[in-house]
Swiss-Prot record:
SMART domains (UniProt xref): AAI
Protein task: Plant non-specific lipid-transfer proteins transfer phospholipids as well as galactolipids across membranes. May play a role in wax or cutin deposition in the cell walls of expanding epidermal cells and certain secretory tissues.
Endpoints of the signal sequence: 1-25
Biological process per Gene Ontology, one example term: lipid transport
Pfam families cross-referenced by the UniProt entry: Tryp_alpha_amyl (PF00234)
Family, as annotated: Belongs to the plant LTP family.
PROSITE patterns cross-referenced by the UniProt entry: PLANT_LTP (PS00597)
Highest taxon above the source species: Eukaryota
A GO MF term: lipid binding
Keywords from the UniProt entry: Disulfide bond, Lipid-binding, Signal, Transport
Protein name in the entry: Non-specific lipid-transfer protein 3
Source species: Lens culinaris
Disulfide bonds: 29-76, 39-53, 54-99, 74-113
Length: 118
């Protein structure tokens, strides 16, 4: 469970760039953390992201097509990131690029999810 939350933090960094809070977000925090759980080893300083990690990143991006979805996912990720021990901010910021995903926002735990637009 702690690993899922840590992964979610990393995903949050990535998704907060893509997702934001909304009243009816289709993306649940469980989905966000579950999709990004395979990324935890990379997010905490491991070697490059695994294929399953990148598949989760792409799945999460596809699951958040609207501004509200992206903001909701972003907020879930920020919460999860706070629970990941030894989160490597550089690896979190590099995750989208390593997975060949383009996100027009900075990936960071300090990202303001409310500013994310679709």
């Amino acid at each position: 469970m702690a690993r899922s939350m840590n992964l979610a933090c990393v995903a949050l960094v990535m998704c907060m760039v893509v997702i934001a809070p909304m009243a009816e977000a289709a993306v649940s925090c469980g989905t966000v953390t579950g999709d990004l759980a395979p990324c935890i080893p990379y997010l905490t300083g491991g070697a490059g992201p695994t294929d399953s990690c990148c598949a989760g990143v792409k799945k999460l991006l596809a699951a958040a097509p609207t501004t509200a979805d992206r903001q909701a996912a972003c907020n879930c990720l920020k919460t999860a990131a706070g629970n990941i021990n030894n989160l490597n901010p550089g690896n979190a910021a590099a995750l989208p690029g390593k997975c060949n995903v383009n996100i027009p926002y900075k990936i960071s735990t300090t990202t303001n999810c409310n500013t994310i637009k679709f």
